Amino acid sequence: MITLRKLPLAVAVAAGVMSAQAMAVDFHGYARSGIGWTGSGGEQQCFQATGAQSKYRLGNECETYAELKLGQEVWKEGDKSFYFDTNVAYSVAQQNDWEATDPAFREANVQGKNLIDWLPGSTIWAGKRFYQRHDVHMIDFYYWDISGPGAGIENIDLGFGKLSLAATRSQEAGGSYTFSSQDIYNSSKDTANDVFDVRLAGLETNPDGVLELGVDYGRANTTDDYRLADGASKDGWMFTAEHTQSMLKGYNKFVVQYATDAMTTQGKGIPQGSYGSTFDIGEGDDQLHYVDRYVNNNGKLWRILDHGAISLGDRWDLMYVGMFQKQDLDNDLGTDWWTVGVRPMFKWTPIMSTLLEVGYDNVKSQQTGDRNNQYKITLAQQWQAGDSIWSRPAIRLFATYAKWDEKWGYIKDGDNTLRYAASNNSGFNTTSRGDNDEWSFGAQMEIWW
């Protein structure tokens, strides 16, 4: 029996328990780590074609990486709520027991849901955020990603689709110059690159098929009394259309993208090009001289991409990707990049499987006309928490073989790697790996939760 003297304490404890349940902290994240060796000796090597923006990742990741997310719904009244989300990332070379590293503070934002009565279902947000990212998992390639500090409103229900509006920022070192400052130490400063993003998603096109359309505008935002270097890329556009088809207990995504000028460098919705590095050939000495100045990214980029993950029965799952990307720049520093790959999975039991990943990359230099190509094959035996190709955590043993033939590379000037390309027989020191092959083997864990 609870006496009156004990009643206030019991009420306080009960209120505390209920509050703790209502305000529970969400813990999410991602991590991978392992150990590997190379056939020719030494630690594990990873293989990526020169000029390609990504690599086939199964049995081909040489670092320990983790993202730790803590979040909490801090207030809720009816269907209205505020949610606070954070994310800190770490990456080390997995070479020692003690590897110190500075964390990357990747997310810190607040999301308010259903706060605007005349826009039910919408969310307003502000802060650093991973914003509606689109990627190909098997090559770890983000083709639409404007993440960064920003603000916006998303999931506005229009009846036929959902509209999202956002603005984010990505800082670019250097690029803004002034000649009016009396302080020589303030003669240049970093350039703030702004992105304005509009997306319309959930457009029903056919049974189990939806379309998403997006427009991104990026620009270099200079401070008063500063100006961009002459000829620097000041702004650009990116247009995206993505069709998602639900099929075979999975999906297929077909994507078409077009970008101009400052949006061509990364090709994912973040502007670059107001600053960079290049080189000059000295008159009379034919020597390479490193010059710290802008890089002009004026031009265009086309990308056609198809990727997906499907089930082919009780025992088989499959991931796949095929992509062509053409970066056609006015200064001839672009590339043509072809990539195609598959990752079938055979399930021996609900928790044990064998995976085979085969990937091929071909990259043509716009400047030299030469091509780099690489194919990579990985066989892995895996134990995972479930019978899906997406099931994690997973522990895998792997063996990887890569064969490449590279005819060009980016010019190296000491410790600097420049955007200019040169053929292997040009006489310049380049990043080209030549014609060779290698194999590696090891063990890795991967988890997300």
Swiss-Prot record:
Induction statement: By maltose.
Flavoprotein recorded as keyword: no
InterPro entries: G_neg_Bact_CarbUptk_Porin, Maltoporin, Porin_LamB, Porin_LamB_sf
Highest taxon listed in the record's lineage: Bacteria
Keyword terms: Cell outer membrane, Ion transport, Membrane, Porin, Signal, Sugar transport, Transmembrane, Transmembrane beta strand, Transport
Coiled-coil segments on the chain, per record: none
CC per GO annotation: cell outer membrane; pore complex
CDD domains assigned to the protein according to its UniProt record, in alphabetical order: Maltoporin-like
Catalysed reactions listed for this entry: beta-maltose(in) = beta-maltose(out)
Signal peptide: 1-24
Compartments it resides in: Cell outer membrane
Site description Greasy slide, important in sugar transport, residues in chain: 30, 65, 98, 251, 390, 448
Intrachain S-S bonds: none
Membrane topology designation: Multi-pass membrane protein
GO MF annotations in UniProt: maltodextrin transmembrane transporter activity; maltose transporting porin activity
Keyword Transmembrane: yes
Database matches in Pfam families: LamB
Primary residence: membrane
Function (record text): Involved in the transport of maltose and maltodextrins.
Stated family: Belongs to the porin LamB (TC 1.B.3) family.
PANTHER family attached to this UniProt entry: CRYPTIC OUTER MEMBRANE PORIN BGLH-RELATED
Quaternary structure and interacting proteins, as annotated: Homotrimer formed of three 18-stranded antiparallel beta-barrels, containing three independent channels.
NCBIfam families per UniProt: PRK09360.1
Name of the protein in question: Maltoporin
Record organism: Citrobacter koseri (strain ATCC BAA-895 / CDC 4225-83 / SGSC4696)
